[in-house]
Amino acid sequence: YEVGMMKGGIRKDRRGGRMLKHKRQREENDSRNAGALTEARSTALWPSPLMIKHSKKNSPALSLTADQMVSALLEAEPPVVYSEYDPSRPFNEASVMTLLTNLADRELVHMINWAKRVPGFVDLALHDQVHLLECAWLEILMVGLVWRSMEHPGKLLFAPNLLLDRSHGKVVEGFVEIFDMLLAASSRFRMMNVRGEEFVCLKSIILLNPGIYTYLSSTLKSVEERDHIHRVLDKITDTLMHLMAKSGLSLQQQHRRLAQLLLILSHIRHMSNKGMEHLYSMKCKNVVPLYDLLLEMLDAHRLHAPAAKGSPPSEDDPLNQLAVPSPSMHSLLPCYVNKQEEGNEQEAI
């Protein structure tokens, strides 16, 4: 044979490369099949009566005009909830906390129904719907409180029959700091003259907050879920800009107002974290018993907290006695479905 030629026309130093190529192809096929199996198992873990009716790319929410989006969000607004305030009862730490936790628990029932009506929300996996609500529920309650209190300087309108000032906040240990932050946010809303259409957009942005992506389901569909949330958030942001343009603001003023509104959301997040710590403290001190749904939400939020994920909880931590997450099903899931059914029955009545 001539130099460089071998019998069969295949050089030994090339044969190994071809074998590695075939090996890589087999590994890629095995990985693809394993991913499909994992996805199928994940879907089986979450049997849901709330079936996803549309693919993410064909979601009706993404085809809505700005005016249609505003109309949908306004129609989704929950009903007014009254407190169980009794003027004959004295105002003390226990009575105030009982009033507020009872009110929050009943508002949470309506919040679930509201979230289901936010365009694009039900197109997410049920597991991710639950996670988003678990992480944002107190922020949603607080931004609603701030909005209701706009016309009451120096006071917070928790319900139509429950208007509290700073002196009432001092009754509860550690609550006055949160009370002052809520008053400051309400004052900011009033100064900016936030309108109802802008408020419902902000509340929906809180629900779909991109900072919560780390808590979404770890499946092959998670990327699609995140992309869908991005698209819905873009749609809501465009709706906000449309509202500002209709009000006659220049483009520069629109951008400035949008930035100011979104900056308030970081303040709402900070208040929510403070409120969660305070509520958990009240729970540990047995100041007031927490209702089922409120307790589930509190436990779930703490289980998702970055601090809780970063280090294992201590055996002495009261959190261990409050809730134990299920390895296959989230503890809030049955409550999530049941509360929605209860809300639907109340609306039918």
Swiss-Prot record:
Residues 1-38, 306-327 are annotated as: Disordered. Residues 65-301 form the NR LBD domain. Keywords: DNA-binding, Lipid-binding, Metal-binding, Nucleus, Receptor, Steroid-binding, Transcription, Transcription regulation, Zinc, Zinc-finger. It comes from the Eukaryota. It holds the Pfam family Hormone_recep. Residues 12-24 have a biased composition (Basic residues). It is found in: Nucleus. One of its GO terms (cellular component) is chromatin. GO terms for biological process: cellular response to estrogen stimulus; estrogen receptor signaling pathway; regulation of transcription by RNA polymerase II. InterPro entries: NHR-like_dom_sf, Nucl_hrmn_rcpt_lig-bd, Nuclear_hormone_rcpt_NR3, Nuclear_hrmn_rcpt, Oestrogen-typ_rcpt_final_C_dom. Residues 1-5 bind DNA. GO terms for molecular function: estrogen response element binding; nuclear receptor activity; steroid binding; zinc ion binding. CDD domains: NR_LBD_ER (cd06949). The steroid hormones and their receptors are involved in the regulation of eukaryotic gene expression and affect cellular proliferation and differentiation in target tissues. Belongs to the nuclear hormone receptor family. NR3 subfamily. Binds DNA as a homodimer. Can form a heterodimer with ER-beta. Composed of three domains: a modulating N-terminal domain, a DNA-binding domain and a C-terminal ligand-binding domain. This is Estrogen receptor.
